[in-house]
Amino acid sequence: MLKIVQGALDTDKLLKDYQEEACTKNFGAFCVFVGIVREEGNVQGLSFDIYEALLKTWFEKWRHQPKDLGVVLKMAHSVGDVLIRHSSFLCVLMGANTKNALKLYEYFFKNFKRNAPIWKCYLSDNERIYAKKKDHLLKGSGLLA
């Protein structure tokens, strides 16, 4: 399941809901990653732009891969502004055992960072500053793709 949320994530509620689902399904592994906007220089927060249609397509392809290992993938990401010390990203991999859930972690995050159509801007002095250093070309993007 993919959730796109305006502003900061309510990680307490999301984690509670996902953990209840894991317990209902009798899963023994509940692996969580939470991305928190950290203080850096004079940055007051981050702002995210998401190409929702592409993100949903990417996530649907990715979501089916863990099923073969008995793992369920949940992801939530912010769109818009998120101030420092608030969460912008949550990923949960849950399954019957830890081995399979942890096996997918590194691969998922590498793939997410390279292929998810999410762009980041720094919020500084009431301006959005595009984070060009963090950007890369998406496979299959561009006019001649």
From Swiss-Prot:
This entry's Enzyme Commission designation comes to 2.8.1.12
Q: Does the keyword Transferase apply?
A: yes
Decide whether keyword Transferase is in the record.
yes
**In which residues is substrate bound?**
36-38, 97-98, 113, 120-122
Q: Which UniProt keywords apply?
A: Molybdenum cofactor biosynthesis, Transferase
The reactions it catalyses are: 2 [molybdopterin-synthase sulfur-carrier protein]-C-terminal-Gly-aminoethanethioate + cyclic pyranopterin phosphate + H2O = molybdopterin + 2 [molybdopterin-synthase sulfur-carrier protein]-C-terminal Gly-Gly + 2 H(+)
- What does the entry give for GO biological process? Mo-molybdopterin cofactor biosynthetic process
Please list the GO terms describing molecular function.
molybdopterin synthase activity
Instruction: Give the pathway listed in the UniProt entry for this protein.
Output: Cofactor biosynthesis; molybdopterin biosynthesis
The family annotation for this protein states: Belongs to the MoaE family.
Quaternary structure and interacting proteins, as annotated: Heterotetramer of 2 MoaD subunits and 2 MoaE subunits. Also stable as homodimer. The enzyme changes between these two forms during catalysis.
Q: What does this protein do?
A: Converts molybdopterin precursor Z into molybdopterin. This requires the incorporation of two sulfur atoms into precursor Z to generate a dithiolene group. The sulfur is provided by MoaD.
Q: What is the protein's given name?
A: Molybdopterin synthase catalytic subunit
Q: Which organism is it from?
A: Helicobacter pylori (strain J99 / ATCC 700824)
